[in-house]
């Protein structure tokens, strides 16, 4: 799995865990729902750290907690 896909899946998992929709998350983060949706699908090729931090702030978790998941353990190499 590549990092972009892992970020998108992690957002889905965290929304389910916190029992909120993407629209609710966007409201809490102060970003447009389209920003989050683009991070979750093919439109965003490189989710930015600032956007991820806003999502973490909206979920009241740290960036460390966001990435502290097995999804990020065996990512595909970017440089081959």
What is each PLM-predicted segment?
Residues 15, 26, 56:
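The alpha-helix within a helix-turn-helix
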Residues 13, 38, 67-80:
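Short, charged recognition helix plus adjacent turn
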Residues 19-38:
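Short alpha-helical DNA-recognition segment
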Residues 15, 40, 51:
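DNA major-groove recognition helix of helix-turn-helix
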Residues 1-20:
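A short, Lys/Arg-rich alpha-helix, primarily the initiator
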Residues 43-54:
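Short, basic-rich loop-to-helix N-cap that marks the start of a DNA-contacting helix
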Residues 12, 23, 53:
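Residues within the helices of the helix-turn-helix
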């Amino acid at each position: 799995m590549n990092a972009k896909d892992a970020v998108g899946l992690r957002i889905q998992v965290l929304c389910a865990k916190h029992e909120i929709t993407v629209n609710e998350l966007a409201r809490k983060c102060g970003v447009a729902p389209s920003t989050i949706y683009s991070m979750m699908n093919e439109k965003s090729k490189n989710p930015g750290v600032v956007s991820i931090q806003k999502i973490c702030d909206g979920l009241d978790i740290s960036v460390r907690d966001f990435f502290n998941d097995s999804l990020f353990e065996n990512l595909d190499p970017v440089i081959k």
